[in-house]
């Protein structure tokens, strides 16, 4: 009764969903980039991830997120996060989202293409 599975969410509603959440829990075993993680970070939501290589080194446990490996880790972290027993990593997480902003990454990619093109 304390968990909501809303399905696919579009547009401005997604920002409200992330922002209104106590926690963004992403226990995926496999991931390529983690766009949903970046969305949650950009909305200043506390993050709990599975500790998998896809999030290294940009997501750092106890710095800009929390990471767990086992179900018991997740249970412990969820309880501590929702009861405010752990320091917030939200502001550091938000910095990660800003560093990976699409406009910034697009500009960097353009510069790389232009450099390669000039060779």
What spans do the regions from the language model cover?
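Short alpha-helical donor nucleotide-sugar binding micro-motif in glycosyltransferases
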Residues: 8-9, 16-21
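Conserved acidic donor-binding segment of nucleotide-sugar-dependent glycosyltransferases
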Residues: 59-72, 79-85
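Short hydrophobic beta-strand element within catalytic cores of glycosyltransferases
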Residues: 46-49
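Nucleotide-activated donor-binding/catalytic signature segment of Leloir-type glycosyltransferases, i.e.
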Residues: 1-9
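Short alpha-helical segment that forms part of, or immediately flanks, the ligand-binding pocket
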Residues: 15, 33, 38-42, 53-57
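Aromatic "clamp/platform" in nucleotide-sugar-dependent glycosyltransferases that forms part
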Residues: 29
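A charged, aromatic-enriched C-terminal amphipathic alpha-helix characteristic of glycosyltransferases
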Residues: 87-115
